[in-house]
Amino acid sequence: MAIGMSELKKGLKIELGGVPYRIVEYQHVKPGKGAAFVRAKIKSFLDGKVIEKTFHAGDKCEEPNLVEKTMQYLYHDGDTYQFMDIESYEQIALNDSQVGEASKWMLDGMQVQVLLHNDKAISVDVPQVVALKIVETAPNFKGDTSSASKKPATLETGAVVQVPFHVLEGEVIKVNTETEEYLEKVK
C-alpha cells in the first residue's frame, strides 16, 4: 500500500528502495514560493543509519512488510543471541548488529519484540521499563542526602545508569530503556 506525503508522521514505518525505515523526525515546510514539502530524518532498520530525506507533493513510499513477533530471549553465546518464538517454539539466532542497544537491557527468559522484514529478523525491542539488579555501585557516605546528586550503578546486564545516592548495591531498580534513566526502586 502506498503512503502519501500528507500521511507521514514520527514513528511511521516506510520502505524506500526495498529498505525499511522508521521516521524519527519530520518537518512540514511551506515555502513562500513553490510547493510544500516534508523534510524527514529516517532510520534504517537494517543498519541503524539515519539519513535526511525530502518528500515533495505527490511522492509516495511503500508500507514495508514488517511483522512484530513476541519472542523469549534465551541466552548470549559468543557473538550470537538466541531467541525462541513463544508460539511455535522455533529458535532463531541474531547477531550484535541485529540486537543493537537492546542487548544491555536483556535478561535470560525476558520477552522481547523481534521485528521481521520479509520473514528475516532485523531488530529487537525490549520493554520500555525493565527491573534489574544493581551489581556494583559506590557506597553511601554520611551527608549524601542531596536529591539532585547521582552516582553510577552497574546493572546485572552490564548497563551503567545514574542512580540517587540512597540506592544500594544488591537492590532491584526500574529503568526506562529509551532514556536510560533510573525510575524507582522495586519494592
UniProtKB/Swiss-Prot annotation:
> Which GO-annotated molecular functions does the record name?
translation elongation factor activity
Where is this gene product found?
Cytoplasm
Q: What is the lineage of its organism?
A: Bacteria, Pseudomonadati, Campylobacterota, Epsilonproteobacteria, Campylobacterales
Give the protein's function.
Involved in peptide bond synthesis. Stimulates efficient translation and peptide-bond synthesis on native or reconstituted 70S ribosomes in vitro. Probably functions indirectly by altering the affinity of the ribosome for aminoacyl-tRNA, thus increasing their reactivity as acceptors for peptidyl transferase.
Q: Which InterPro entries match?
A: Elong-fact-P_C, NA-bd_OB-fold, Rib_uL2_dom2, Transl_elong_fac_P/YeiP, Transl_elong_KOW-like, Transl_elong_P/YeiP_cen, Transl_elong_P/YeiP_CS, Transl_elongation_fac_P
Q: Mind telling me what this protein is named?
A: Elongation factor P
Record-annotated disulphide pairs? none
Pathway noted in the entry = Protein biosynthesis; polypeptide chain elongation
Pfam families (UniProt xref): EFP, EFP_N, Elong-fact-P_C
Assigned protein family: Belongs to the elongation factor P family.
Alphabetically list the UniProt keywords.
Cytoplasm, Elongation factor, Protein biosynthesis
* Provenance organism: Helicobacter pylori (strain P12)
- List the Gene3D superfamilies hit by this protein, alphabetically: 2.30.30.30, Nucleic acid-binding proteins (2.40.50.140)
GO biological process: any one? Answer: peptide biosynthetic process
Which PROSITE patterns does this chain map to? EFP
Please give the GO cellular component terms listed in this UniProt entry: cytoplasm
